[in-house]
């Protein structure tokens, strides 16, 4: 248990994944990172992920309809729970394999990858992550957050930022009071 807490402290992933196995080394991703998938819906997620990382100052990211040249390979694995995912960066090929039980699972895996990139990268021009394998699935089906705009006004941009934050923390339900 203590070792697991130490690993969590090093990776700093929120919420804490079910299982994290680190190798102790890091992976420096190439200057041009390609996120690829054979699935059109996963490519739409990849495009959204790239735009979020670019907003955070990362560059050299693109998406591709093929897994062959991809640095980050997205796929669906029906053996996983619907919102579960595995993220594996332990290969000597310096690639990241991300499989989800559904599109939702892949999205949660991308949120974890973003947290790893932001935490481990000192310079956004040189992306780096720890070499690790994560197996995760939510413990609760309903994970919600509430925003009450009826009693306190928020701008559209503030609401969008709030939604991005709760999504990054794998919250799947947004309860919004407008009146």
Task: Place the predicted regions along the sequence by residue.
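Contiguous, structured surface segment used for ligand recognition
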Residues: 7-142
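Substrate-binding cleft of carbohydrate-active enzyme catalytic domains
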Residues: 138-179
């Amino acid at each position: 248990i203590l070792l697991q807490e130490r690993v969590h402290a090093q990776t700093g992933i929120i919420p804490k994944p079910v299982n994290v196995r680190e190798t102790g080394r890091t992976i420096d991703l190439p200057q041009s990172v390609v996120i690829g998938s054979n699935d059109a819906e996963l490519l739409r997620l990849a495009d959204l992920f790239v735009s979020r990382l670019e907003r955070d100052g990362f560059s050299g990211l693109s998406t591709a309809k093929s897994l062959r040249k991809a640095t980050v390979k997205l796929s669906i694995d029906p053996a996983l729970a619907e919102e579960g995912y595995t993220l594996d960066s332990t290969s000597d090929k310096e690639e990241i394999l991300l499989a989800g039980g559904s599109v939702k699972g892949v999205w949660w895996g991308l949120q974890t990858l973003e947290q790893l990139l932001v935490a481990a990268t000192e310079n956004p021009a040189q992306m780096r992550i720890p070499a690790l394998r994560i197996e995760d699935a939510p413990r609760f089906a309903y994970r919600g957050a509430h925003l009450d705009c009826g009693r306190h006004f928020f701008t559209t941009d503030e609401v969008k930022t709030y939604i991005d934050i709760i999504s990054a923390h794998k919250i799947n339900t947004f309860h919004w009071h407008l009146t």
